[in-house]
Amino acid sequence: MTTISDLPYDLVKEIFSWVPFTSLRAVRSTCKTWNALSKNQIFGKKSVARNQFLELMILDSRVCSLRFDLQKIRNEDEEDLVDPSMKQISIPNNDDQVEISRVYHCDGLLLCIPKDNSSLMLWNPYLGQTKRIRPKNTFHRDDSFALGYNNRNHKILRLNEENESHIDVYDFSSDSWRTVPDDNPYRDELIYQSGVSLKGNAYFFDREVTTEAEVGTEDLLITGIEDYLRCFDFTTERFGPRLPLPFILPSPSFEYLALSWARDDKLAVLYSHYDTFDIIEIWISTKIEPNAVSWSTFLKVDMSLINGLTDDFLIRFEPKSFFIDEEKKVAVLFDTKVTETCRYQMAYIVGDDGYFKSVNIGVISNSHWIGGELVRSSYVPSLLQLQV
């Protein structure tokens, strides 16, 4: 009798190419041969290529997968459907269900930061492998991290606001931490939580604040705020020069910014100024290196022109994370919606032609009502072994 283990390789390959990332564990469990095959090569490239964006989000201190199917938006022949689905992902070897506060991503690997700051947890979701990383010195709540690599040797960057003259780097090849000097003269201006990994390096927002003394007092007045981009190069283990952002900033400038990854190794940056809070601009990089960047406009949206949006919504609207779909020419912006009894995680799909659609992802149930943080859009698997 023929069994599933007897199926031709090409057919097995085709089957796996259509399996969603979140269902791999169940499919692997059906057959030892399938389990071995899927852990030696990546079959899911076809599903990645489709317009089903697989996002990873932290919600209620748990890592969740959030799948958006944008194929049917702007489709005149069919109903305008998005149909998102969210699912909590169980972290292997996490029997005590450690709560996660932040997650950093690089090329299919996730670096999970537990709330108790006792250790780091490196996770390869595709292979179902984890690795605990103990600190050289005690981790702190305000530490920030980033994942990167040089010559395929992965590393972890640790930034500590209390120690601005040194940085800590964890090297996978030696399984150890080392402290290296940091000669970055603007380290105190880095916006630590903004780090995004791209092509093996990590990019952060950098802010320069200028002040002058107020006449007759000892107070300082802010006269200007300028934002830049800075790259941490994991090959040299140094920060590069300040890189320009594409906006013309008023002075003094008070705005909110968000940084995201776009397909084909590009960065996307979102900008909105508090004086014109209803205007949202998104730009994408046309060139991005540790010491150089150039930008092109992706879209500019005047939210006040969208029918049905109230002034109260526009004032409170502050998307903390986003991703873009270049083919559909839309951006998906993540924010929270507050009612008298609940807080909801929301996604807002916007286009520069006035297209707008709101999507209720679910109720935020944690006691602090903290909204979800988008970790990564268009997750692509990795075959890097964490357990040798």
Swiss-Prot record:
Stored InterPro entries: F-box-assoc_dom_typ1, F-box-assoc_interact_dom, F-box-like_dom_sf, F-box_dom, Gal_Oxase/kelch_b-propeller, SCF_F-box_component
F-box domain boundaries: 1-47
Q: Which top-level group of life is the source organism from?
A: Eukaryota
Enumerate the PROSITE patterns for this protein: FBOX
| CDD domains registered for this protein in UniProt | F-box_AtFBW1-like
The protein here is known as: Putative F-box protein At3g49520
